[in-house]
Amino acid sequence: QHETNHETELITLRRARKYRRSHFSFSFVRNPFDRLIAAYNNKVIENEEPPQPMQNMGVTHGMSFEDFLDVLIETPYKQYDVHVLPQSQLLCIGNQIVPKFVGRVEQINEHWAELRDILARQGVEVMESLPQKNVRRRDRGGLQDYFNSDALIEKTLQIYGDDVRLFYNDVSVDHL
């Protein structure tokens, strides 16, 4: 069970799978490269002290991005802080995606409209559009500063390869 800062209840995947027949579940995933950079910048660079779960992993304030990746590679997923845990670990049992609908943050308006249509057919009304929160990067420029070698891309794929394969299989890694 991973912490969500007491903002939401994060149920286990097995419990979610039990609800799958009687409930409609959905999730939005984020480009794993963007998500990784956001976690690194916020938790390692901006915060004076990384969250305790990250400290337990060996993450320290101001460590280099490559050292951060090495810590992630060396740490078993069960010890990950939720901010860096691969989304496939949160949303899948094996390679089975538990939510019935998975949209992408990068296409949130389009995918939200699609989800709204699905929910409307089931008699569920939801807001017309979603509020913009925690928007940090609107262009692709910021990623190249971090992923400036094939080795760093490979290390990232070693951790988040399942996320790319399951949720971004129609997008070239060069375009993530």
Feature map (PLM): residue ranges:
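Membrane-interface amphipathic segments in extracytoplasmic regions
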Residues: Q1-L176
